[in-house]
Design a protein with these regions (language model features):
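Conserved coil-to-alpha-helix start sites within the AMP-binding
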Residues: 18-22
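Phosphate-binding glycine-rich loop
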Residues: 1-11
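Active-site phosphate-binding strand-loop segment of PLP-dependent enzymes
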Residues: 34, 39-108
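Hydrophobic/aromatic ligand-binding patch that stacks against planar heteroaromatic rings
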Residues: 4, 24-26, 86
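Conserved core segment of the aminotransferase class I/II
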Residues: 115-181
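Helix C-cap/helix->beta junction micro-motif
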Residues: 29, 89-90, 120
């Protein structure tokens, strides 16, 4: 997904600590991973002032991992709204890694940031690897939502990349049908 977005030197905001694949993908695509602080003293929530300080003219997107891996933090609506406001102000794409969305506990509620930002372009990632404990089957998806008009080139690039791939394996397709009903 980064190859379709980033040109050499473009920046993407990524939480720290993060799941290392995000940094690797940004770097592999020729971009620069710019890490924003998620402070343990603040329940591992993103530091909005730090995010704002790190936005430049080269910043294309912001990544959130909610629920967060590795911290386990689940972002409340107020935190998500602040991220939406920053993304809106700076015309950033939102990449939302929500692979742990079905694994919240103690009555907590997961809120997808895309549901709060219909005017922004959001790319939401999820799958069955974690929630159904079938990581080896590599079953996942990305959902493009919001203002797709501002992301035509990105969508076209993503289509080209996906067309170069074969479909998932047959047992995995059967598992998806069973798991999602």
């Amino acid at each position: 997904c980064m190859s379709a977005l980033l040109d050499n030197g473009d920046e993407i905001l990524i939480p720290s600590p993060d799941y290392p694949l995000w940094t690797a993908c940004a770097t592999l695509a020729g971009g620069k991973a710019v890490h924003y602080i998620c402070d343990e003293q603040a329940e591992w929530y993103p530091d909005m002032d730090d995010i704002r300080k790190k936005i430049t003219s080269r910043t294309k997107a912001i990544v959130i991992i909610n629920p967060n891996n590795p911290t386990g933090a689940l972002y409340p609506r107020e935190i998500l709204q602040q991220i939406v406001d920053i993304a809106r102000e700076h015309n950033l794409i939102i990449f939302s890694d929500e692979i742990y969305d079905r694994l919240v506990m103690d009555g907590a509620e997961h809120i997808s940031i895309a549901s709060m930002a219909p005017d922004l372009f959001c790319v939401t990632f999820s799958g069955l690897s974690k929630s159904h404990m079938i990581a080896g089957f590599r079953i996942g998806w990305m959902i493009l939502s919001g203002n797709k008009a501002i992301a035509k080139d990105y969508i076209e690039g993503t289509k080209m990349l996906s067309n170069m791939r074969l479909c998932s394996n047959v047992p995995a397709q059967s598992i998806v049908q069973t798991a999602l009903g």
